[in-house]
Amino acid sequence: NYLLELNKLFDLGFSAVQGVRDAKNLDTLYAALDGARDIYYHFYDGKLLYHVGSSATLAGSGMAFTTQLYKECLGHLDITGAGFDKILQKEIVSRGYRIAFANEAIVFDEKTSKSDQLVNQRARWINTWFKYFSFGFGLIGKGIFQFNWNKFLFGLILLRPPLFIFLLIGLFCMLLNLILNPFLALIWFLGFVIFIIGFILALAINNTDARIYKSLWGIPTFIFYQVLSLLKVRNANKHSVATKHFHADKKTQ
């Protein structure tokens, strides 16, 4: 079914398609919260972004391309470390292509089960954002001068920091404005309320597993470990991000 769903969009003329990365395991707090994060990003940065006329962001897995486009975008580049998907999506969109989103093309992804693995993975992924977010400026510029909505909107998305950094900046601004300007603090608070509603909406629309809803109480802990990841960003590429499987350990305990 996965390949059939991808082919529906290739048959429509698209050369790049992003599918849905669904959680294979939801047996720990971290795995369930990682699954919630994927649902949020697939809904807003995938489905919604594609349907408003831009491109779905690449998730690093569950994606497909024509061989010709892949070679055209990466064949002349020497890429080391994490972040090839960041480079690839920039090359695709800058060439005038759109990345389609296949909501029914589902690939199952093993989720992070332990905190140390979460820290190492997030450190490397945060590192790639700092390394490649500047791509957004170029795409915004091209979008403005070429009157290209796809490039302009996609460029804006590339400039947005990882979700936990975005939330922490918002919290800092709200607390600061409690002292400087209470009215602006209220605006920031309303922004948080809208975000929470939007987050729950993304989960509700996707018929989310009950275990993910039950895990939401652990969001502060999840954010804490991502802050720890931020402290390891400089040496992030030295750490492996391959998800280790611990199911066998549980069976022997």
Regions found by a protein language model. Name each.
Residues 80, 110-127, 211-214:
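Nucleotide-sugar-dependent glycosyltransferase catalytic core
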Residues 157-237:
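Membrane-embedded multi-pass helical conduit in multi-pass membrane proteins
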Residues 20, 99-106:
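Catalytic beta-strand/loop signature of glycosyltransferases that borders the donor
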Residues 119-173:
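Active-site-adjacent helix/loop segment of glycosyltransferases
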Residues 39-44, 119-140, 222-235:
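Catalytic core of nucleotide-sugar-dependent glycosyltransferases
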Residues 5-80:
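Long helical/loop segments within the catalytic core of UDP-sugar-dependent glycosyltransferases
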Residues 1-3:
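Acidic donor-diphosphate engagement hotspot in glycosyltransferases and nucleotidyltransferases
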Residues 82-88:
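Acidic donor-binding loop at a coil-to-helix junction in glycosyltransferase catalytic cores
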